[in-house]
Amino acid sequence: MVGSNEQREMQRVAVITGANKGIGLEIARQLALHGVTVVLTARDEKRGAGAVESLRGSHQIPNVVFHQLDVRDESSVGALAEFVRTQFGKLDILVNNAGASGISVDVEGLKSLGIDPEAWLSGKATSLVQGVLRQTYDGAVTCFDTNYYGCKRVTEALLPLLELSTSGARIVNVSSLRSELRRMPSESIREELSDIDNLTEEKIEGLLRRFLEDLKEGRLEATGWPMMLPSYSVSKTVLNAYTRVLARRHPSMLVNCVHPGYVKTDINWNTGVITTEEGAKGPVMLALLPADGPTGCYFDQTTKAEF
């Protein structure tokens, strides 16, 4: 992709998942404007290639390339890793942005409720939306396989290339306000996920299996799981936990997670209140952290916050 070995070493390269629209596309645009070569990925090849063409054309940004990626498909993830290895020889920035809501929604019914943003953010909308948002078992499986296992799949495949970064690797996991432990009704689950010294992927994945079993048996509320966007909320809570495990395991990298803000995007059925440009600021800041920047932290937009 580039001429000399020296050029390769100096060039910063980023991979962004789920980047054909919304926050992901805006993160790609902003990083490219900072001189980073961006590998924009998307599950849909036509939409992803179209997003790259729009950046190159109307935005006059040449340093963006497309590669197809389905975070739920091992072979697709492997193909991306091989592409980055052969084209760039290393990776400096990984932004795990691909996500799924895990919910079946009656969009018109949701619109008719006219729920204000404050009700969404505070959790007061939980009881209002139960009739229009439906959590299915299959939806939860897809949600976990995308938001947690998909992130893990991509990260593990790209870690060898991130370890070769000459500028210091950055991993940014795009999370959600719904991830915050204070929103988890179960005290025992909160305590388990707060015990950072003993937190492991095995424990995290055990929690996901428990959730699925409780969902199947119809006892989510009784066992203390969140009832607002249940699988989505839990997937982002464990994504934060995985971020802390990664940061501890790879001290030479800066690994953080971030709630981008209540952005108006497809994943929240366009109920958000801030623009994608605003929402991308936190992830971009973390992707470009200086060498002495924080790691193993959670950010609410650009401000460090409590898990």
Language-model-detected regions and their locations in the chain:
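Catalytic loop of short-chain dehydrogenase/reductase
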Residues: 100, 106-144, 163-248, 259, ...
